[in-house]
């Protein structure tokens, strides 16, 4: 569960390392976001010589959460970190690589490009 002020790691090669969520999209007073939801973030930490600068406002899709993801078959899934992938206005990832596994719910939500770039879909 991601909410305002939550800090997330960035799981792609755009150059951003950490972002802070300041808006959960999808409703007038929506409080929490989970895997597959879009959030608006501020970049807090970047790698040197990256195209994204500290303080930039970006949209991102959540790909991993520490909170359990409950599935229809009764199983649950949990990751070690809260992570996201930075996207453009059309919903395509800005980076060309994605690091670490992602949840299957990403593909179900329509982010096929992100799931195809990931090394492992759980």
Swiss-Prot record:
- Provide the GO biological process annotations: translation
| Protein's UniProt name | Large ribosomal subunit protein uL14
Source organism of the structure: Chlamydia felis (strain Fe/C-56) (Chlamydophila felis)
| Keyword terms, alphabetized | Ribonucleoprotein, Ribosomal protein, RNA-binding, rRNA-binding
Originating gene: rplN
Gene3D superfamilies the UniProt entry points to: Ribosomal protein L14
Can you state the subunit structure given in the record?
Answer: Part of the 50S ribosomal subunit. Forms a cluster with proteins L3 and L19. In the 70S ribosome, L14 and L19 interact and together make contacts with the 16S rRNA in bridges B5 and B8.
SUPFAM superfamilies linked: Ribosomal protein L14
CDD domains linked: Ribosomal_uL14
Q: What does this protein do?
A: Binds to 23S rRNA. Forms part of two intersubunit bridges in the 70S ribosome.
**What parts of the sequence cross the membrane?**
none
